[in-house]
A protein has these predicted regions:
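Asp-box/BNR beta-propeller blade signature and adjacent active/binding-site loops
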Residues: 1-282
């Protein structure tokens, strides 16, 4: 790895709060890499040459706590961006759509607001057959479980937010489909009564498990946090050989050093074997 400071616009140093990178392709097959941040006014930079050079464009101007925590491509080639904002004492999840590869975005609208709860940090993804969108959300009161909602019409309407399975209770979910189509979703554990509370974990199960609020197959403690819950916000990738790479910021040593960016690699073949051995011991 190497730093890219010299390639970034000078004003990028003023962008604040969890910059997030997304690749988008417009209807003319033009590819762009976008980096959105939260403040001021959801600023952004863009690269049209695969990240070699970058330029700043006008901010989106959307009021937010955090920028897009999820961007999902729709069947018509447009993209849906989801984020959250403060509304008085409540939190709201909003969505906006781009039809030109990220250059312009529609007026945002609220898609999740739950009395007595605080939905935020949405992660949207497709069902294996591509027909349904699922959106997992952090529940920021941390008094119960995380939240999820579903859409069968490409995000035009969403179901009423409901509790996730206990094992998916946490912050800033991000997931991938493994080569066998099982879901691997990583997050900061916030499940009440969990032995891995505040650590960096992953949930393994099927989409049907999630859709029907079943527990899933098992959970994995990926990394121990030595700074309480100050970890997570992962990136997730599946390599061609099926290896899952989960990357997070975390304080992974009990010393004076602060957080590092750490990647952990595993295959479901390995974790399945560990789970089988554990079950046999029990």
């Amino acid at each position: 790895w190497k730093r890219l400071d010299d390639a970034l616009p000078p004003n990028f140093k003023t962008h604040r709060n969890c910059p997030s990178i997304y690749r988008m392709v417009d209807s003319q097959c033009k590819e762009r890499l976008w980096v959105f941040s939260a403040q001021p006014r959801m600023p952004r930079i863009v690269s049209e040459d695969g990240g070699t050079t970058w330029k700043e464009t006008e901010p989106l101007g959307f009021e937010c706590v955090m920028t897009f925590s999820s961007v999902v491509r729709l069947n018509d080639g447009s993209y849906l961006g989801l984020y959250h904002r403060q509304a008085g004492s409540a939190l709201q999840v909003l969505q906006t759509r781009t039809t030109d590869g990220g250059l312009s975005w529609s007026e945002p609208r609220v898609v999740a607001e739950v009395e007595g709860k605080a939905p935020c940090e949405p992660f949207a993804f497709r069902s294996p057959d591509g027909k349904e969108l699922c959106c997992l959300m952090r529940e920021n009161t941390h008094q119960g479980r995380s939240l999820m909602m579903f859409s069968l019409d490409e995000g035009q309407t969403w179901s009423r937010p409901q509790d996730t399975p206990w094992g998916l209770t946490g912050d800033r979910h991000m997931g991938v489909y493994a080569s066998d189509k099982r879901l691997v979703i990583a997050f900061r554990d916030k499940a009440q009564g969990s032995s891995t509370y505040d650590h960096f974990v992953a949930w393994v199960g099927t989409y049907d498990d999630l859709r029907n609020c079943r527990p899933g197959q098992y959970r994995i403690k990926l990394l121990r946090s030595y700074a309480g819950g100050d970890c997570g916000y992962p990136g997730m990738e599946v390599l061609p050989d099926g290896t899952v790479v989960a990357t997070t910021y975390i304080k992974y040593r009990p010393d004076k050093e602060k957080q590092s960016v750490v990647s952990t690699r595993f295959t479901l073949k390995e974790t399945d074997a560990l789970q089988q051995a554990r079950s046999a011991d029990e």
